[in-house]
Swiss-Prot record:
Alphabetized UniProt keyword annotations: Amino-acid biosynthesis, Metal-binding, Methionine biosynthesis, NAD, NADP, Oxidoreductase, Sodium, Threonine biosynthesis
Gene name for this UniProt entry: hom
Spans annotated as Disordered: 255-274, 377-402
Family indicated by similarity: Belongs to the homoserine dehydrogenase family.
Gene3D superfamilies: 3.30.70.260, Dihydrodipicolinate Reductase, domain 2, NAD(P)-binding Rossmann-like Domain
This protein's name: Homoserine dehydrogenase
InterPro entries found in the cross-reference section: HDH_cat, NAD(P)-bd_dom_sf
Pathway(s) served: Amino-acid biosynthesis; L-methionine biosynthesis via de novo pathway; L-homoserine from L-aspartate: step 3/3; Amino-acid biosynthesis; L-threonine biosynthesis; L-threonine from L-aspartate: step 3/5
SUPFAM superfamilies according to UniProt: Glyceraldehyde-3-phosphate dehydrogenase-like, C-terminal domain (SSF55347), NAD(P)-binding Rossmann-fold domains (SSF51735)
Cofactor note: A sodium ion is seen in the structure; a metal ion may subtly affect the relative position of the nucleotide-binding region to influence enzyme activity, and could increase the stability of the enzyme.
UniProt lineage: Bacteria, Pseudomonadati, Pseudomonadota, Betaproteobacteria, Nitrosomonadales
């Protein structure tokens, strides 16, 4: 076998891990990949760091195009997040008939049509296993096995290790969001840019939905909601009700379209994915027979395994001269699925927390508003004692039956207008696998 040469664009966390795995396993598994020729193109262009990681064993340069047009390179790992610069190198690589392995989700969304067109013309692979869920091989699993099945709930994912870490700290230590965020910022890069982290998570969600349902990648159709307004009280109350707070990102397929939501949801503690805590990721796939598969690796590890998996696939394709097993980005122009446009059309049960003063008829007014909107208050028999304690402190929470979100929005506006209610109402969606 003639070895395959690999060029890495970026050698930070992901790129460095990829280099280490390829170099370490070269002799052990006899993989037909030579140690990668590395290009370091991070914003700081820190070539000294690149030389330190590689130990001076490979060529290092700060010119991305020198790696792209190098005839020896059959594979390119693309790690840097500078979108337009990487798009240019992507075009050049496709023209040079190089297989491209990308960990850059924003790049896949922003330039998907152009990359797909050029890649198909040149007959090269565009692989992006590492772009979702921190190294879980979920793209191959969904594309080859569980995707496009007529299930009401196909994919649910915890695909932001930083968010999951913050929620775990809030639950275990009872800290406020701002305190945990400040503690996490020196250690976790995504914690320093919360708004960017939310966008990255929505990118991952959109990729999963596109693969699962064969829809075009429509990032502007994804609903994104952070956890900054979540209080430690909500996490504690969820535990008392038998739920555990998680930042679920769930593309689902009801009859009218595909729902896309990135939002914090209380989830029953007995579900198979509830052991995913701290910086771990998890993806849960439900099939048409209501069975559940959970993919749950350690998100603290490098994405290298996912990048290397794509490189190995590309190597097999090159030697056997067959078409790629995973179609480029998997969006079908003839797909009948559409993204549902408004979050107000989503159906869910809801948890409400509100602060109220002690006035006669207070609970009756709230119940009447919920009943007017065809909403039903659910009493928690096991939590009656705790509810009594919360009534004395002026805090209530009401788990409700399934309803359309726009009805709940109207009810919340009416509840907040009551004289006995102080401040705004906290609302969380409560999801269960049986729905």
């Amino acid at each position: 076998m003639k070895p395959i040469n690999v060029g890495l664009l970026g050698i930070g966390t992901v790129g460095g891990g990829t280099y280490t795995v390829l170099t370490r396993n070269q002799e052990g598994n006899r993989a037909p990949c030579r140690p990668p020729n590395c290009h370091h193109a991070r914003r700081d262009r820190n070539l000294e760091l690149a030389r330190k990681v590689t130990g001076g064993q490979i060529d290092v340069t700060d010119d991305a195009f020198a790696v792209v047009v190098r005839p020896r390179h059959r594979h390119r790992g693309r790690i840097d997040r500078r979108i337009h610069h990487r798009a240019r190198t992507g075009y050049e690589g496709d023209r040079e008939r190089q297989a491209r392995v990308a960990a850059n989700k924003a790049l896949m969304l922003a330039w998907q049509r152009d990359f797909r067109r050029v890649a198909q013309q040149k007959g090269v692979i565009v692989a992006f296993e590492a772009a979702v869920a921190g190294g879980i091989p979920i793209i191959k699993a969904v594309a080859a096995g569980a995707g496009r099945q007529p299930s009401s709930r196909v994919l649910r994912a915890i695909i932001n290790g930083t968010t999951n870490f913050i929620l775990s700290e809030m639950r275990e230590k009872g800290l406020a969001f701002a305190d945990v965020l400040k503690e996490a910022q020196p250690r976790l890069c995504e914690a320093t840019r919360p708004s960017t982290s939310r966008a990255w998570t929505a990118h991952k969600l959109m990729i999963l939905a596109a693969i699962g349902f064969g829809i075009p990648m429509q990032f502007d159709k994804a609903y994104v909601e952070g956890i900054s307004k979540l209080d430690a009280l909500d996490i504690r109350y969820a535990e008392e009700l038998g739920y555990r707070q998680a930042a679920w990102h769930a593309p689902s397929a009801p009859a009218r379209g595909v729902e896309l939501a990135r939002a914090p949801d209380p989830d029953p503690r007995e579900t198979p994915d509830r052991q995913c805590q701290r910086r771990h990721n998890a993806v849960l796939v439900s099939d048409a027979c209501r069975s559940h598969l959970v993919y749950r690796p350690d998100a603290c590890r490098r994405h290298a395994s996912a990048v290397v998996a794509d490189i190995v696939d590309g190597t097999r394709t090159a030697y056997h001269r067959r078409a790629p097993a995973v179609p480029h980005l998997l969006s079908s122009p003839t797909s009948s699925w559409t993204c549902r446009f408004a979050i107000g059309e989503v159906s869910s049960a809801y948890y409400l927390r509100l602060r109220a003063v002690d006035k006669p008829g207070r609970d009756g007014h709230v119940t009447r508003i919920l009943a007017t909107g065809s909403l039903h208050r659910c009493d928690d028999s096991e939590g009656n004692r705790r509810q009594a304690e919360r009534r004395r402190s002026g805090r209530h929470h009401h788990p409700d039956h399934v309803t359309v979100e726009k009805n709940m929005d109207d009810a919340i506006v009416a509840i907040e207008a009551l004289p006995a209610i102080s401040g705004s109402v906290t609302r969380l969606r409560m999801e269960e696998l049986s729905r």
